Design a protein with these regions (language model features):
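Acyl-group handling in specialized metabolite and lipid biosynthesis
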Residues: 13-21, 44-50
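Eukaryotic N-terminal low-complexity, Ser/Thr- and Lys/Arg-rich leader segments
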Residues: 2-13
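Short amphipathic alpha-helical segments and helix-helix/interface helices
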Residues: 29, 93, 122-126
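A short N-terminal helical cap/helix-turn-helix that marks the beginning
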Residues: 2-4, 18-41, 59
Length: 128
């Protein structure tokens, strides 16, 4: 759903380019968070509905990482994530990385209007 007054993140920044010299994905995000760029999210009709700077992503992912570990998850545990192209997926994916958890991306439902039923089905499968 499009939101009014969503500003896109810039496409250029002043950070020096670093090619493949990061040892972890979180190290790369830590570096990118020093700049101004980020990710923009669009509807199927091309309207922006959310933006997330890498600095915001890093802060939110670190907060979520602490919350996930606070639920009793241990490093190395797997966390199922429905792989949708939205800010929550990216937040939780990076939260898992920071917490030492293994994000397991599950395919998103392709049926229009079937999201809730699909998530319920995944929940039953994961509990089995």
């Amino acid at each position: 759903m499009p939101q009014a007054n969503v500003n896109t993140t810039p496409t250029s920044h002043t950070l020096p380019f670093r090619a493949a010299d990061f040892t972890t994905l979180t190290e790369a995000l830590d570096y990118a968070a020093q700049g101004e760029t980020g990710s923009n999210f669009y509807t199927g009709r091309g309207a922006i509905y959310a933006s997330l700077s890498y600095a915001e992503l890093r802060a939110q992912a670190l907060d979520l990482a602490h919350k996930l570990l606070g639920l009793g998850l241990d490093k190395g545990d797997r966390v199922a994530l429905v792989a949708e192209t939205n800010p929550d997926f990216i937040r939780f994916f990076y939260a898992c990385q920071y917490a030492g958890l293994i994000p397991v991306a599950l395919p998103a439902s392709v049926k229009v209007g079937a999201h809730c039923a699909y998530v319920a089905q995944l929940h039953l499968l994961l509990e089995a």
